């Protein structure tokens, strides 16, 4: 998005980063990057709009994308800020995240060419800094026919009013059951899901529940539940929901 107009029917906006695990592993990720990666593997041609540093990690991101035949024209390079990193820790088997700030993806620039997207996917984490937040608002203001918001509430990098402002105006939202309870103000039980959909004028809501699978709720009152097959061994679940988001997007 630097210096030229970009076009993309399927746009993915947000962070690309490296997850750093306690055992020393470093895994390329970030929910938007993972979603774009999966969509590319399905044969789609998503335009990933993100930003990396002018460093070895940034070069590794570009190399990985080229190896997947992904479009790199929306991947910006920041001359000062580093490529994103997240230190992942586990407590009672549940992951926690220490997200390094600032990072290159906090400074995703709009430039003169804001793409017209048919479907725009974005998360909530990239809302934390003003530059990326303003670029996202320009993308949303450019008239995508469908906006899919993937909520990721990562303390301390979220604000309830700010996240809800982006939920409103979207057609589809994905979040886990804890995040739904946070955004619904504790009113997620019973008819609370229907009220959340109605109050935010959504077409549908995808709610994940870990080992209990996921449920799709629609504005028409439909409910579709998917339960996972029994797992013999789980290494970690970081990024698992991003594959689900990708499959959901393919069906919209």
Regions found by a protein language model. Name each.
Residues 16, 125, 151, 243:
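Active-site metal-binding loops of divalent metal-dependent hydrolases
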Residues 145-146, 156-223:
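Conserved phosphate/ATP/ADP-binding segment of small-molecule kinases
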Residues 1-9, 190-252:
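Conserved phosphate-binding/catalytic region of the ribokinase-like
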Residues 18, 45-124, 143:
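Conserved N-terminal subdomain of the carbohydrate kinase-like
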Residues 9-10, 118-119, 172, 204:
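Structural motif
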Residues 130-145:
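Glycosyltransferases and closely related glycan-assembly transferases
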Residues 102, 125, 152-154, 178, ...:
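Active-site beta-loop-alpha junctions enriched in small/polar residues
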């Amino acid at each position: 998005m630097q210096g030229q107009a970009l076009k993309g029917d399927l746009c993915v906006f947000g962070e690309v980063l490296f997850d750093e695990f306690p055992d020393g592993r470093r895994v390329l990720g970030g929910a938007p990057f993972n979603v774009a990666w999966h969509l590319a593997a399905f044969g789609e041609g998503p335009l990933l709009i993100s930003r990396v540093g002018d460093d070895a990690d940034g070069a590794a991101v570009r190399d990985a994308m080229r190896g997947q035949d992904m479009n790199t024209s929306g991947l910006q390079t920041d001359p000062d800020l580093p490529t994103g990193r997240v230190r992942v820790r586990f407590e009672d088997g549940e992951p926690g995240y220490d997200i390094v700030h600032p990072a290159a993806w906090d400074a995703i620039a709009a430039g003169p060419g804001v793409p017209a997207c048919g479907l725009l996917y974005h998360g909530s984490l990239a809302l934390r800094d003003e530059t990326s937040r303003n670029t996202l608002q320009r993308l949303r203001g450019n008239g995508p026919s469908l906006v899919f918001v993937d909520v990721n509430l990562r303390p301390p990098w979220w604000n309830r009013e700010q996240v809800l402002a982006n939920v409103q105006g979207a057609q589809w939202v994905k979040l886990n059951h804890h995040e739904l309870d946070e955004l619904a103000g504790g009113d997620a039980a019973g008819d609370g899901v229907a009220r959340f959909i109605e109050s935010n004028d959504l077409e549908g809501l995808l709610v994940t529940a870990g080992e209990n699978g996921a449920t799709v709720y629609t504005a028409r009152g439909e409910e579709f539940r998917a339960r996972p097959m029994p797992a013999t061994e789980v290494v970690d679940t970081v990024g698992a929901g991003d594959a689900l988001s990708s499959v959901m997007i393919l069906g919209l």
